[in-house]
Amino acid sequence: MLIPSNRTKRECILSRLCFLVLSVWVSLPSAAQNNPYKIDDALYPIYQRASKQARQQEGLLVADTLYQQALKLGDKKAQCLAYIIPLQFYISQKDDSKIEKASTDLKEISRANNYLQYYYHAWSSEIIYFLNQQRSLLALQKAE
C-alpha cells in the first residue's frame, strides 16, 4: 500500500485550494462594462435613447440627463458622449452659432477628461458641416 508523503499531501491540498479560489473568482459578477463604448452599464441605455433622439429637441434633455448621471457616477467618457448629442442636434438644425458653441463645449470637456478622440470628433464634425454647406473657405479656416 502506498502511503502519501507530506509533500504530496501539501501539493494536493494546495491544488484543491487553488481550484476552489479560481472557481469562486470566475463565478463572481464582472464589474466591466458590457457595451461598445465601455461606459457604465447604467448609462448606456440613456446614451442610446439620447443618440436616437439626437435630431430632436428631446434629445437635448436626454443628453443633459446622461451628463448629470455620468457626473454622479464619475464616468468621464459618458460625460463626453453626452456633449456629442447637442452638436449633432445643432448640425441637423443648421444653426452655425450653436454648432460652434456645442463644438467648443465638447472640445473643452474632452480635453479636461482626457478623451481626445471626442475633441477631434467635434473638430471634424464642424469642418464636414461647413464643407457640406459649400463653405469651403470657412472649413479650411477651421482646419488650420
Where are these regions (language model features)?
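A "functional boundary" signal
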Residues: 2, 32-144
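Bacterial Sec-dependent N-terminal signal peptides
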Residues: 1-46
